[in-house]
Amino acid sequence: MKNSAHFCFAVLALSAAVSTQAARPVEFTVGSEYYNETYREYEQDGSRLMQQKGNLWSINAGVKYRFNDRHAAKLEGRYSRGKTDYTGSVQYITEDYIDDSASYGSATLKNAPRHAYDIRALYEYTLPINDRFSIAAGAGLGHRVLRDLSSRIDPNDYDRKNRTTYAQINTGVNIALPANFEISPRIAYNRAVKGRQYSYEPDQVETRMKQGGGQGIEVEVPISKKFANGSKISLTPFYRGWQVKESNFTVTEEYDSYGLGSIEPKNHTHEKGVRLQYSF
C-alpha cells in the first residue's frame, strides 16, 4: 500500500518539470460496476478443489492529473461487496489422519459475504496519431485485498483474506466517433510483487502464508459520450483475471515426530461485468 502511494507522489512531482499544461489538467471520475466473480482452487494434478461464485457491486472513483496533452498521472480506487456460493468437498480430520476422499460437491455454503478493494497509481502517456485516433500506454503499482467472511453464515467455518501488491503495464487506443462518441479499448497485464494469504480458524490464531507469483490480465472497452462542458459518461464492459501459484507451507501445530500446517492452493479468478461512470 505504501509503495503505491509513494509511486503516485513521485509521478505527480513531475509536474514541476513540465512547462506546458493541458487546458483542463484535473479530471475526476465516479461510478459503479456490477460483475460476476468465479474463484477456483486446484490440486497439483489439476483437479478442482473448490469454487466460489457470486455477484458483486462496486463503487469506483479516480482522479487524473494531466501535465500536458501527452503525460498524465492517475489514482484509481474500487470497493466491492457481494455474496458467493461455495462448492467443495468434505474433509474428515482426526488426531491420526486427514480423510479428503469425499467427492467434489459434497460440501456447499450459500450466500457467504465477500468484500474486496483495489487501489492503484499509474503513469499514462498518450500519443496522438491524428485528430480522431491516439495510442495510450501506462505503468504503475496497485494493491488489492479480498476477504471471505464465511463464518458469518457458519460459525464453524473460517474466514480468509488475501493481500496482493502488483505492478501493471497497459496499452490501448482512443478512437473518436461521430456525435462526440468515443471508444477506447484497453488491455493490461498485472504481475504480483508481494502476496500474503491469511486464514482465521474459529478460536485459533491467524495463519499467514506467502503467496506470490501471481499474474493477471484486464480487458475493457469503454464507450463514452462527451458533452460540451468537457465531461463525459462511459459504459464499459470488462474482464479481469488472475492466476496465482501455490503458497508456501506454514506449520500451525508441532508434535514430537511431525507437524501440521496450512497451504493455500493455486487458484484462478475470473471477473466479468459492466461499469457505468461519469468523468468531469
Show which residues each predicted segment covers:
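Short glycine/proline- and aromatic-enriched beta-strand/turn motifs that initiate or cap beta-hairpins
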Residues: 21-88, 93-97, 266, 277-280
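Outer-membrane beta-barrel channels and translocator barrels
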Residues: 23, 66-70, 128-132, 176-180, ...
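Membrane-embedded beta-strand positions of outer-membrane beta-barrel proteins
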Residues: 28-32, 61, 73-77, 121, ...
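Transmembrane beta-strands of outer-membrane beta-barrel pores
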Residues: 32-38, 79-85, 125, 141-147, ...
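Extracellular loop and loop/strand-boundary signature of outer-membrane beta-barrel proteins
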Residues: 40-51, 85-87, 96-111, 150-160, ...
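Residues that define the transmembrane beta-barrel architecture of outer-membrane proteins
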Residues: 53-59, 111-119, 133, 161-167, ...
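Outer-membrane pore/translocation modules
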Residues: 82-168
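Predominantly the C-terminal beta-signal and adjacent terminal strand-loop region
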Residues: 203-280
